[in-house]
From Swiss-Prot:
It comes from Rhizobium rhizogenes (strain K84 / ATCC BAA-868) (Agrobacterium radiobacter). This is DNA replication and repair protein RecF. The RecF protein is involved in DNA metabolism; it is required for DNA replication and normal SOS inducibility. RecF binds preferentially to single-stranded, linear DNA. It also seems to bind ATP. The keyword Nucleotide-binding applies. InterPro entries: AAA+_ATPase (IPR003593), DNA-binding_RecF (IPR001238), DNA-binding_RecF_CS (IPR018078), P-loop_NTPase (IPR027417), RecF/RecN/SMC_N (IPR003395), RecF_2 (IPR042174).
């Protein structure tokens, strides 16, 4: 079983509706109950910011600062991490000229937020993701890249560098005259980054597909069949250099078409994640709302198991309103599955009774009026 990573202390200052809040925790799961709007998801969002990126809501950092707070927000966590006990502090100081996120690890400024992945991996499932299979492809790409990032921390940097290069190419193409040699240099960079992104996605999907096949009988949730579409389909058995040459050629040949369109029409930014309900052999978007939710839960739990298997450390799970639409039997099975992953999970709900099957495996807190109390 993977080693357990768990948060032992959490302190928030001027974060969302919390002027100040502190939690002292043990290694068990954490259940947060309270009325809608009390701030349960806000606390989960704070934990999600212990990973690279903008957290589970993808909010601008300035937007998570408590109204009327004088100097931004801060989050402090102490955890038993992948490299022993560690203290992490992160936040934004709005008195600075920049609102860039600051990060300290054991009191030392970090060079990049990617250093967070040396200490823990954080995965989440929220009600906002319920429309993942029926919404636009951009949301599925973002979801896909979060899955990849938890296994390959460099993926986020490659993706942002690719986007930057693509914007430069689009800008050059918008000019009536452009320098072909300069454009070729940008396209070579895009080809290198774009193929690296695509291969990382394909590798993660292959690993996840194999794990799902191996564990189908051990879960009450439906199995997802996964496929990528929209970029170099069926060609990823070729060497990476051949793929880079092929993509660079596509970009070169598509210059005038892309100039007319005002955007780059080929690349990893056009990829879509296709999901099928394996047992019913049905596209996920055609499944019922309940089936889609069950598919998504099963997919997240399978990915959490994969992260634990490959890193040797179980991820911290954030499961917002996870029990709301499950019957008692499936809730109990879900809690058992979460327990077997070997990590610490944070779960929210309005009714503590929904989590009764956890028993002593969890610590319970009530959230109300910008405060958190043990219950």
């Amino acid at each position: 079983m993977p080693h357990k990573v768990f948060i032992s202390r959490l302190k928030l200052t001027d974060f969302r509706n919390y002027a100040a809040a502190a939690l002292t925790l043990d290694e068990r799961h954490v259940v947060l109950t309270g009325d809608n709007g009390a701030g349960k998801t806000n606390l989960m969002e704070a934990v999600s910011l212990l990973s690279p990126g903008r957290g589970l809501r993808r909010a601008a950092y300035a937007d998570v600062v408590r109204v009327a707070a004088p100097n931004g927000f801060s989050i402090f966590a102490e955890l038993e991490g992948m490299e022993d006990t560690v203290e992490i502090g992160t936040g934004v100081d709005t008195s600075d000229e920049t609102t860039a996120r600051k990060l300290r690890i054991n009191g030392t400024p970090a060079k990049t937020v990617d250093e967070l992945t040396d200490h823990l991996r954080v995965l989440w499932l929220t009600p906002a993701m319920d429309g993942l299979f029926t919404g636009g492809s951009s949301e599925r790409r973002r979801f896909l890249d979060r899955l990849v990032l938890s296994l390959d921390p460099a993926h986020g940097r490659r993706a942002s560098d690719f986007e930057r290069a693509m914007r430069s190419r689009n800008r050059l193409l918008s000019e009536s005259r452009f320098d072909p040699s300069w454009l070729a240099g940008i396209e070579e960079q895009m080809a290198s980054l774009g193929i690296a992104m695509a291969l990382a996605r394909q590798e993660m999907l292959g690993l996840l597909t194999r794990l799902i096949a191996e564990t189908r009988e051990a879960t009450p949730f439906p199995s997802a069949a996964l496929e990528l579409s929209g970029f170099l389909d069926g060609q990823f058995d070729r060497p990476a250099l051949d793929l880079e040459d092929a993509y660079a050629g596509m970009l070169r040949e598509g210059r005038y078409r892309d100039a007319a369109a005002g955007r780059t029409l080929d690349g990893p930014h056009r990829t879509d994640l296709l999901v099928r309900h394996r047992e019913k052999d049905m596209e996920a978007e055609r499944c019922s709302t309940g089936e889609q939710k069950a598919l998504l839960v099963g997919l997240i739990l399978a990915h959490a198991r994969l992260v634990g298997n490959l890193t040797g450390h179980a991820p911290v799970l954030l499961l917002d309103e996870i029990a709301a639409h499950l019957d008692e039997g499936r809730r109990a099975a879900l809690f058992d599955l979460i327990d077997r992953l070997g990590g610490q999970a944070f779960m929210t709900g309005t009714d503590r009774a929904m989590f009764s099957a956890l028993g002593e495996r969890a610590q319970f807190f009530t959230v109300a009026h910008g405060g958190i109390t043990k219950s």
